[in-house]
Amino acid sequence: MIAMVLAAGLGTRLRPLTEKIPKPALPLLGSTLLEENLALVARLGVREVVVNAHHLADQVARIARSAADRLGLKLHLSIESPEPLGTGGALVAARPLLDRGETILLLNGDVLTDMDLRPALERHRAERPAATMVLRPMPAGADFAPVEIDREGAVLRIAGLGREGEGVPHLFSGIHFLESVVLDELPTEGPSCINRQGHVSLLRKGKRILGHVIADGRWSDVGTPERYREANLDLLEGRYELPGREAIRGVFVSPEAKVSPEAELRAPAWIGPGARVGAVPVGPRAVVLPGARVEAPLADGVAYPELG
């Protein structure tokens, strides 16, 4: 199996943060989104991965190389220019690297999760659908486009497109296992969407796509300022069961941070490298990300890096 992490998005919902930092490089305490996703790939036993990049591609490439080396992954970079190619076009551009008769693990680069994906992979290998979409129960009031599945777990519709039948709506996690037949459905040039142009096309041809529901574990689409804030605070409190991600019981201060001796630090709190904290209260439940500056009280929140 080979994996691909989609890391070429513009991160428009996270501006102005993403004007200087690409979304996959956004800090999550001492890590980044991209590093967490590459670690997820490695935990599944995958040893080869493609990472695409477009916006601030040099930063994405630098993090990907460092993390892949640390995790023992063979890395391929797929640089998209002059425009990002979407989730489908990214696969087409990287097809020479991906299309080798193996299952492809594809995941969105803005997902943070501790879900155990092994049962989904085992089911995909046993049932051999064209694709297996990893799903979550749909939260009440959520504004995500639904993926509807029948009682056997077969996908009927994606965002209302597909085939007839009575289905139950679920939330797509941004993670799927694919066979190369999916790539055959995508336009050979330009941007495209794997779900709307790949999966929906297969559904209309009567091909089987599986929806595997995982209710356990935590999952977040870290694509908005509020969800990015929540992800950092959840990591601070150890709510994600990830290796090396135990709760911060006290106060962590990086040796590279500068903290005023008059600052009042209250646990739990995390202060990253390059951060500066003045003579103010910080905590409880405070995350000061690398390069951030705090000159006013901070509690139950996240201080972001300066963008000047």
Protein language model features and the residues they cover:
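N-terminal nucleotide-binding beta1-loop-alpha1 segment
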Residues: 1-19
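Conserved N-terminal catalytic core of the sugar/cofactor nucleotidyltransferase
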Residues: 1-5, 29-108, 117-119, 298-308
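Generic preference for hydrophobic
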Residues: 3, 25, 77-78, 158, ...
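Active-site metal-binding loops of divalent metal-dependent hydrolases
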Residues: 10, 109-111
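Hydrophobic packing residues within well-ordered alpha-helices of enzyme cores
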Residues: 14, 60-64, 231
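Catalytic-core segments of class I nucleotidyltransferases/pyrophosphorylases
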Residues: 103-105, 112, 118-125, 138-141, ...
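A short, conserved acidic/glycine-rich loop-to-beta-strand motif
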Residues: 127-137
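Structural signal for interior beta-strand "rungs" in well-ordered beta-sheet cores
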Residues: 246-308
